[in-house]
Amino acid sequence: QKDGGSIYYINLSQDEFKLGGSSFAQTLNKIGNDVPTIKDSNFFKKAFNTVQELIKDSQIVAGHDIGSGGLITTLLEMCFADVNLGAKIDFSVFEEKDIIKYLFAENIGIVFQAKDNATIEAKLNANGVSFYKLGNATTEATLDFGPCKLDIVKYRDIWFKTSFLLDQKQ
């Protein structure tokens, strides 16, 4: 949301960014052997329950799971929700420096926008839930991450067209 707080990412898998089994790997006609998995089921449960509490307390104003297409697709789809909505993202928070891995890995995770950053961070920290603060929503229809600025209108049109064509085949 344009007037919301910061954008956060929680890697529910607690695994490294892996491309095996991803849509990205499929575009290269590969499946891959190294697929992400949930490394710590206790963390998963703790993080899930904490996020549910934050939703119940109206502290999360928008959210999306990481699924097909990875983090880049999630961020784009979150920006598709409104006109003149974009995001400025800083991926330097990740230890992983391979941009392909963190953009396209399909590790189970969530991205959400906070109502109040301090409340969100206090709750996550108190419950031992690790998170990454990625950036903020903007009123410019671009997904801006360092050297790349993606035009939301252009990618929304591609997404709708692709979804329409896929629906016709199903």
Please name every model-derived segment.
Residues 33-36, 48, 52-170:
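Glycine-/charge-enriched secondary-structure boundary and capping motifs
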Residues 1-39, 52-55, 115-116:
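Mobile "lid/hinge" segments at catalytic clefts and subdomain interfaces of large enzymes
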Residues 39-46:
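C-terminal transmembrane module of polytopic alpha-helical membrane proteins
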